[in-house]
Amino acid sequence: MKLKNLALALTAVCAAPVWADNAVSLIPLPQTVKMEQGTFEFSKKLKTAVDAYPGDSIQWVLDNFEKNFTATTGVKFQTGKMGKAALQLKLNSSLAAEAYNLKVDEKQITIEAARPAGFFYALQTLQQLLPTRAVLAGKAVGEDVKLTLPAVSVSDAPKFGWRGFMLDEGRHFYGKEEIKKVLDVMAAYKMNRFHWHLTEDQGWRIEITKYPELTATGAWRNSKVLGWGDTKPDGQRYGGYYTQEDAREIVRYAKERFIEIVPEVDIPGHSQAAVASYPDFLACDPGMKHEVWLWQGVSPDVINVANPKAVQFAKDVIDELTNIFPFGYIHLGGDECPTTKWEQNKDCQKLLAEIGSKNYRDLQINFYKQLKEHIAKKPADQQRHLIFWNEVLHGNTQPLGNDITIMAWVGANQAAKEAAKRGMNTILSPQIPYYINRKQSKLPTEPHSQGHGTETVEAVYNYVPLQDVPADLQNRYMGVQANFWTEWVEDASTVQYLMLPRLAAVAEAGWTQQNLRSYPDFLKRLQKEVEYYQQKGVNYGKHVMEAK
């Protein structure tokens, strides 16, 4: 059988993958793809066979795939025998946890993987190989579409274990169905970490049963628009929050897509909504008026870390989050925490002297130290690793140890390198260009947001995560993450427009080896995503697709 190279195993100095005339369009680009002659044609019934696995979790992957595939295509699945079934999921223990091999010929589809995640990602690739993106989008396939797969061999594995996206719902609230759409798109691009920014000065979005005022008061503010410059608060009652059952529903939804959810409660800074809910023990100046913030920027109204009740509050919040979100990481923020009110508070002044420091930033470190010690006392299945924004590095991190993770955003390359040198793990989330809430073009039609339109799809794609990182530090780099802040973004359609297709570019940086990446090649493959976005019913940057 004559083979045609779709993507060659290239060295770092070589050109982009060579595309055949009949090349398929896959994002993220796999390690190797070889097109063969022939096609696999689906009939009305598909016999399947699955190797046994603890908990039947590979069968669970296939069952979830079957629900969508049958609903969108009408193809019925039947249990067959290994070796004879048309779709076979076979264990291959030599592969890495998220790796897979996918082979399609005229008679069979064979998938090999070592873990359920690998089978899931192979099935995502399979859906991209279909002649229509309808199945991937969960929509019915048109009667005029002949359901086939090209004969192909794919060998694939991700570059990074952390391939993330953060959405800020503290500033604006979008609701369960919109979050599920985000998770669907992430899954299509093999992203596996949803960082859920749930608290801010402008809103608290997660139910904490021990502190009901967090959502009774903290989830609501007196303006939908956030004030900035000439833009003033509009006086409209605005807000919303997720009950714990809502959050658990989303956790289950994400799990089916092999996405882990990382909750973030940003404390002790970015906490005016919490302070407004419980000023008696969270405020540095409880005698003053406190309300959920109506403005953009950073509020000076931070949590009083010298109040034992405030420390207990934080511990209680972590306890409830642990029972909602099973993933082994919790993000506690740590960025942009003004120390002005601490400097004016006698208890904070006293605590600073007691810990033997003159740097008020160390009060924040001391606060985190107490929370970390609290978590360490929990049963093993309830312990969590802590993630912080890289401003934490401005203090003396020695009390925290090096078993924390630094999410590097401002001066990201240098901050990540500094964290790695301190023996900490790090995640690259550079403000420029991975803050994809920023304008993605200079067109007059661009929605109002931060930036000057220079964070284009091309700029996002061309960021090189491990550039100039010494080899002995690279094992500290967990992966990459795009972030989306919502000060200016009031509706889900604008989130989608700014997010897409830039999220696909970040996904490819997280999955595809650097020596295979090329923007012209990516842009060519990106054209197929127009159908996916339209079928999915999501907004996107149409100007990118027109710039072929």
Regions found by a protein language model. Name each.
Residues 1-25:
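Bacterial Sec-dependent N-terminal signal peptides
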Residues 21-160, 494, 509-544:
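Contiguous, structured surface segment used for ligand recognition
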Residues 55-60, 116-121, 173-177, 241-245, ...:
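Soluble non-cytosolic domains of exported or imported proteins
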Residues 95-316, 320-329, 374, 481-486:
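Feature activates predominantly on carbohydrate-active enzymes
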Residues 170, 199-203, 266-270, 335-339, ...:
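Active-site beta-loop-alpha junctions enriched in small/polar residues
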Residues 274-280, 292-404, 409-418:
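Active-site neighborhood of glycoside hydrolase catalytic domains
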Residues 385-391, 398-404, 410-548:
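Flexible, acidic glycine-rich loops studded with aromatic residues
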